[in-house]
């Protein structure tokens, strides 16, 4: 019962003495404290140098209470003091550990806070850099877009100018073509008139050819062709009997040819017989070649037997050769290199032999018709070569096997060496263990010399250890025996390797001998091939002789045929002379008819040439149109390529996103693998710690058993009174020894406990990391799902963009068509303008006469010029005959605004065209659109400024008209080409309005206003450039010579036609303007959609970057 109580007390003291509340994780600190306590067991003054008594000392003192002996109370007091000091030390240690842990916790929190702040600052810096980069990219993109638009507008202007120039050239070509067609038709009519005069027949019964219309020429030509066909059929009827005569002559010539062929066959048979005699001689030569081949075969068999004998000798000599492993390796490497080179040479020789054999085969096939017996010999040679190749392949396989064996032996040698090294390391480790065990045994023997019973136990332990030593010695002996056996195996393997190298060398020699024999055989084969070539040459010579004979025979036959044909021709000529004398008159008539047919056919050819020229002109026009369409196609392709580039960029971004997703997946896989590795390491560590704890527990149990034995011995020793002090002293010595052991065990236990706590912390940390990784996996999975959804959205958007791109391409095609229509309409309007101005000039030509007596009564303005600050007032008073080269630079705007301006200018020009009337009657016939235009112009300009300018101009014009009446000049009617620059500014177009006097009898006076630019009408009404530069500008006020009724009758139809065309053009232009506006709206919608998509893509990219960060 007392022992149990002591044990319970000691167990209560253990946790207080060993473990602390805080539990510091540093084993170094614990060991240092233990060192200080053990060293200073005698001093009791300071706290840090007090002795440390474990529970075993208390348990040893517990049985002493029952048996009093001198010095017992002193020991108990000392023990109590020691226990109080230990408790105080434990409290202070716990407090210091708690303070240390708090400081660590605060430091960790501060470090974490600083890291978070650093991350936030880095995020902000990256965001600012991204924003700046995006702004710079957006600015560069906007600049590039503006530059592209400017370039496209310049290209469009250049294309319009080129189109106008091409249209003017095409118009001139068409005029020339019309003139040439008219000349051709006149020539056809003259040819038909000549045909009527020559034949005396009338093609048309009612009308003559000179008065016939061009449309009826086709029917007349068809009649002539029908008549010619009837005449040709009549001539063909006469040709048939002549063909019958020719057939009879052909049959006779065929009979003669058959006779000649029979003679030729007889000669060929003779030549064949001679050729067979020559073939028999060649067969004899072939038989001799076969005998030589048999002799070669026998020699090859002898060589094979020699090679076998040599191989047997080599196998016998393999057991006698020995060498070291290092020499073996070097020799093997060198032999391998040499052998590979030789094998390559042999393979090359085999390839050459195969190529030569294939050539021999082809030559044999060609010569098989003449010498078929040589095939057997060549086949035998080929069989021999195949046998040699098989033997070489077998030798190669044997060499490979030997090499594999050598490599295997070298590998086994390396493994054995490694095992030897491992065993040596184990032996060294066992020796170190033996030394450690010996040292431990010696220490135990020295400690237990005082105790008699302890000596017996130590002897038992020594005996067990000696048994273990003997067992380890036996293991070492076995290992040494195994090593010796392995060394023997290594030596035997080295010998076999040396034998194999010797055999390889011998085989190489045999291969060299076989190669020499093969070269000899090749030389013989070459000789045989030379003989075959000689025979072939002889055969070719015979064939050439045969071909020459056949050619001579054919020449003879042809000459015979020619002689017979000449004879037949002479006979036929004699017969035909009489017939030709009869049919000479008929032939002359036919000749005349044929000449007529030839002339007709010539005319048809000329017509066909004319049609061909027309088609060529059409083809040229179509080619010009095709070139224009190609230019437009290039523009559309460029636009489409830009759109495709944008789509490709989007795809590239999508691929980048997919690559990033893949990288994230790979990172997750790597993290999962690292997590598994950490799990495995933790399991291994936990198992090791468990094993160490089990060992320490076993040691504690053994120590406890030893303590129980010492207690029993103490109980037995208490009976003896005289020897009590001696036993006590001995026991104290034993106790001091045991205390050292117990202290060591306690330090180990504390170290293990600290390791367990650290392992638990690591386990907790790993659990936290696992939870973090699981959270990160969940977040990555959610992000992956989001990215998949966003990718699907992007794909749908790409599909929509593709559809929109297709729609935009269709719209661009329509826009190009609209541009074509606008250009055509402009060309038509310009053409109508030119026609109208030409008609007006023709009507005005005789009416312009200089008259200085007549003065205008009323002056009204018709058009207002744009005032320019740089132009002086003297230039504003010049008349419509002066030429000005000043042009204003219009700013570059959008293509839609340019189109609108062009449309407005065309409307003004079309509305101003009817204002070119010269009399009151022409004013009465104007359309209401002219009055509206005049009202607008008059409302826009103040009357005072206009009257002053007009008065000044009228005075100047009257002075100049008086001077210019002496030298009147004629107006030039040369048309001036219209440039697109003349239509850009509406103020550049001149308008001419005439107002009647109140009485209606006086002629209308005219006021002309000049502008910095020339209008097309102005350029048409003015004289040539040289006259305009040399002569002074004059203003002419004239009276019309013709009556008003005649003027009205002559100009009313032209005004009506121009009015109708102008209305049509206005309607078309309005429809085109609406189309252009619709297209502009669609383009704006598309641009807005594209911008929105770009913004979404940028948002997605920003989100991805944030997630990655």
From Swiss-Prot:
Region (Disordered): 1-31, 843-897, 952-1061
Chain intervals with Low complexity compositional bias: 999-1019
One Pfam family in the UniProt entry: CCDC158
Biased composition (Basic and acidic residues): 1-12
Skewed-composition ranges (Polar residues): 17-31, 862-882, 953-970, 988-998, 1020-1037, 1043-1061
The protein's name: Coiled-coil domain-containing protein 158
Keywords: Coiled coil
InterPro entries: CCDC158
The keyword Glycoprotein appears for this protein: no
């Amino acid at each position: 019962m007392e022992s149990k109580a002591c044990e319970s007390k000691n167990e209560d003291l253990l946790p207080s003495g060993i473990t602390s509340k805080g539990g510091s994780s540093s084993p170094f600190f614990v060991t240092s404290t233990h060192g200080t306590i053990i060293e200073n067991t005698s001093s009791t003054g300071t706290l840090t140098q007090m002795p440390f008594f474990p529970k075993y000392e208390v348990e040893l003192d517990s049985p002493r209470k029952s048996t009093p002996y001198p010095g017992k109370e002193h020991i108990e007091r000392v023990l109590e003091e020691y226990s109080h000091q230990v408790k105080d030390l434990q409290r202070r240690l716990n407090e210091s550990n708690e303070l240390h842990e708090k400081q660590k916790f605060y430091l960790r929190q501060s470090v974490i806070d600083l890291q978070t702040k650093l991350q936030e600052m880095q995020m902000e810096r990256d965001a600012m850099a991204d924003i700046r980069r995006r702004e710079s990219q957006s600015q560069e993109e906007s600049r590039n877009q503006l530059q592209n638009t400017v370039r496209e507008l310049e290209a469009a202007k250049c294309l319009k100018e080129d189109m106008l120039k091409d249209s003017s050239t095409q118009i001139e070509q068409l005029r020339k073509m019309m003139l040439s067609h008219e000349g051709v038709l006149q020539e056809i009519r003259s040819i038909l008139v000549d045909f009527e005069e020559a034949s005396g027949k009338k093609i048309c019964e009612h009308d003559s050819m000179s008065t016939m219309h061009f449309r009826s020429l086709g029917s007349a030509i068809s009649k002539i062709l029908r008549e010619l066909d009837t005449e040709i059929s009549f001539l063909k009827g006469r040709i048939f009997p002549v063909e019958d005569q020719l057939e009879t002559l052909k049959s006779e010539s065929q009979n003669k040819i058959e006779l000649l062929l029979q003679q030729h066959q007889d000669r060929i048979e003779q030549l064949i017989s001679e050729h067979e005699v020559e073939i028999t001689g060649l067969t004899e030569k072939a038989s001799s070649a076969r005998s030589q081949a048999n002799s070669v075969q026998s020699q090859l068999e002898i060589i094979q037997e020699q090679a076998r004998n040599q191989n047997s000798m080599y196998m016998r000599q393999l057991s006698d050769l020995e060498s070291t492993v290092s020499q073996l390796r070097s020799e093997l490497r060198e032999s391998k290199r040499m052998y590979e080179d030789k094998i390559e040479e042999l393979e090359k020789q085999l390839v050459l032999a195969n190529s030569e054999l294939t050539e021999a085969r082809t030559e044999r096939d060609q010569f098989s018709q003449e010498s078929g017996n040589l095939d057997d010999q060549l086949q035998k040679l080929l069989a021999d070569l195949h046998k040699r190749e098989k033997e070489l392949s077998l030798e190669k396989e044997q060499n490979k096997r030997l090499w594999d064996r050598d490599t295997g032996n070298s590998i086994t040698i390396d493994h054995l060496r490694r095992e030897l090294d491992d065993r040596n390391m184990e032996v060294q480790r066992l020796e170190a263990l033996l030394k450690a065990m010996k040292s431990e045994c010696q220490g135990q023997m020295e400690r237990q010399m005082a105790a008699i019973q302890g000596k017996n136990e130590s002897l038992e332990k020594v005996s067990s250890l000696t048994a273990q030593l003997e067992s380890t010695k036996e293991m070492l002996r076995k290992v040494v025996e195994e090593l010796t056996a392995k060394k023997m195996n290594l030596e035997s393997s080295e010998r076999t390797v040396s034998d194999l190298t010797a055999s390889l060398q011998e085989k190489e020699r045999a291969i060299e001998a076989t190669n020499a024999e093969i070269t000899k055989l090749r030389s013989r084969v070459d000789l045989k091939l030379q003989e075959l070539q000689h025979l072939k040459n002889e055969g070719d010579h015979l064939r050439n002789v045969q071909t020459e004979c056949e050619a001579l025979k054919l020449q003879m036959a042809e000459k015979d045929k020619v002689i017979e044909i000449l004879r037949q021709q002479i006979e036929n000529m004699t017969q035909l002379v009489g017939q030709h004398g009869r049919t000479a008159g008929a032939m002359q008539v036919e000749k005349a008819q044929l000449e007529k047919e030839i002339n007709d056919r010539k005319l048809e050819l000329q017509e066909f040439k004319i049609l061909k020229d027309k088609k060529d002109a059409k083809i040229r026009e179509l080619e010009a149109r095709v070139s224009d369409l190609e230019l437009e196609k290039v523009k559309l392709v460029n636009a489409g390529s830009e759109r495709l580039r944008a789509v490709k960029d989007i795809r590239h971004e999508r691929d980048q996103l997919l690559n990033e997703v893949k990288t994230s997946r790979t990172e997750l896989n790597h993290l999962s693998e690292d997590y598994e590795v950490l799990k495995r390491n933790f399991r291994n560590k936990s198992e090791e710690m468990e094993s160490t704890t089990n060992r320490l527990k076993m040691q504690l149990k053994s120590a406890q058993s030893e303590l129980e034995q010492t207690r029993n011995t103490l109980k037995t020793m208490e009976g003896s009174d005289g020897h009590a002090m001696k036993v006590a002293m001995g026991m104290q010595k034993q106790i001091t020894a045991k205390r050292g052991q117990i202290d060591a065990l306690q330090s180990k236990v504390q170290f293990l406990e600290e390791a367990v706590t650290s392992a638990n912390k690591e386990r907790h940390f790993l659990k936290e990391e696992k939870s973090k990784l699981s959270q990160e996996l969940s977040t990555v999975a959610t992000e992956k799902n989001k990215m998949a959804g966003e990718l699907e959205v992007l794909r749908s958007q790409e599909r929509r963009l593709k559809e929109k791109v297709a729609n935009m391409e269709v719209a661009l095609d329509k826009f190009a068509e609209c541009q074509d229509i606008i250009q055509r309409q402009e060309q038509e309007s310009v053409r109508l303008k030119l026609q109208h101005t030409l008609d007006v000039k023709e009507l005005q030509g005789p009416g312009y006469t200089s008259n200085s007596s007549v003065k205008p009564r009323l002056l009204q303005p018709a058009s207002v010029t744009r005032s320019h600050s740089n132009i002086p007032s003297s230039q504003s008073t010049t008349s419509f005959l002066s030429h000005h080269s000043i042009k204003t630079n219009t700013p570059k705007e959008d293509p839609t605004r340019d189109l609108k301006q062009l449309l407005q200018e065309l409307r003004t020009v079309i509305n101003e065209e009817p204002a070119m009337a010269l009399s009151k009657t022409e004013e009465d016939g104007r359309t209401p659109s002219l009055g509206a235009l005049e009202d607008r112009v008059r409302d826009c300009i103040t009357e005072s400024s206009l009257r002053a300018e007009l008065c000044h101009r009228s005075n100047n014009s009257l002075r100049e008209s008086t001077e210019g009446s002496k030298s009147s000049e004629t107006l030039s009617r040369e048309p001036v080409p219209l440039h697109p620059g003349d239509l850009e500014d509406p103020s550049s177009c001149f308008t001419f309005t005439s107002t009647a006097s109140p009485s209606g009898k006086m002629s209308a006076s005219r006021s002309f206003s000049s502008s910095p630019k020339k209008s097309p009408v102005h350029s048409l009404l003015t004289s040539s450039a040289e006259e305009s530069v040399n002569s002074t500008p004059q203003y002419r006020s004239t009276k019309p010579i013709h009556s008003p009724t005649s003027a009205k009758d002559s100009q009313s139809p032209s005004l009506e036609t121009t009015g109708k065309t102008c209305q049509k053009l206005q309607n078309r232009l309005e429809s085109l303007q609406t189309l252009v506006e619709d297209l502009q709206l669609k383009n704006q919608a598309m641009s807005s959609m594209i911008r929105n998509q770009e913004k979404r893509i940028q948002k997605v990219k920003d989100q991805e970057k944030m997630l990655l960060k």
